[in-house]
Each structure stands twice: as structure tokens, then as C-alpha cells.
């Protein structure tokens, strides 16, 4: 008889408009910090290209997302994917646009500035993007503590 206990993974979906920055950061941190207790994905309403500033600041944090692809939240919905948490990470995606996924335990909104909207020199934009990255990491750490 096999005495192994199978623990259900906590499934998390992060949603933003383009799936190019904030949702990608959050997904990467859940994958890194959540261990095998979590399964994370991210998607957007209008998938675009990964923001190069985000790729760079995540590389500084020793997380390589350069090969990540942006995905459509509507494709996930049509496929009938189930999530314990659906977390919107930009104000534009928190409203009516976000589909209601069946079986959601919690729907949460985290408001973070969009790195593509930052003004200033490249270094100033990089510093602002690092700040967003660090804020998202803290939010993910809190989520992991709460969910486990």
C-alpha cells in the first residue's frame, strides 16, 4: 500500500491587460517562492510583448522570464481551467472585463503601476520597475503565507 499523501496544488491565475509585465512578475514569483504547493499562470485581455524592462529586472532577481509568452485570459476561460485564486494586478483588469472562472475560491485585486507608463531616463524607468517588482514579490509572499 502506498502511504504517500497527495496534496492538492493551489492554482493561481494573475491577470492584467497585456500580460507583459505585472502578471508575468507575479507568476514568476509564485513559481519561485511557492514551491510544489502552487501552480501559477498569467494571462491578459490583449496579450502583447514582454516588457524588456521587466525581463531585465527579473534577471537581476535571478529569474529568467525571457522565454515567457503572453497568453489570453479568454483562452484559459474557454478551456475551462479551474483556479483557487484569480488575482488582477492592474486597475484596468479588475472590473467587468475579467471573466468569472468556475470554482474560484478567491478573486483578489492588487493595484500596481504599469512599467510601460513610466517616464524618465532608462535608468529612472528601470528603478521604477524594480520598485514594482519588489512590491509584487511582497504581495506574493503574503499570498503564499495566507494560502498555505
How would you describe each model-predicted region?
Residues 1-77:
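Conserved active-site segments centered on acidic
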Residues 46, 79, 113-115:
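Short, solvent-exposed coil/turn elements at secondary-structure transition points
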Residues 95-148:
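Phosphate-binding/catalytic loops
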Residues 81-103:
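Mid-chain, well-packed structural core segment of small domains
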Residues 19, 58, 86-87, 136:
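Conserved small-residue
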Residues 5-11, 78-89, 129:
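Cytosolic catalytic domains that perform sulfur/thiol-centered chemistry
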Residues 44, 90, 111-113:
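Residues at the C-termini of beta-strands that transition into short coil/loop
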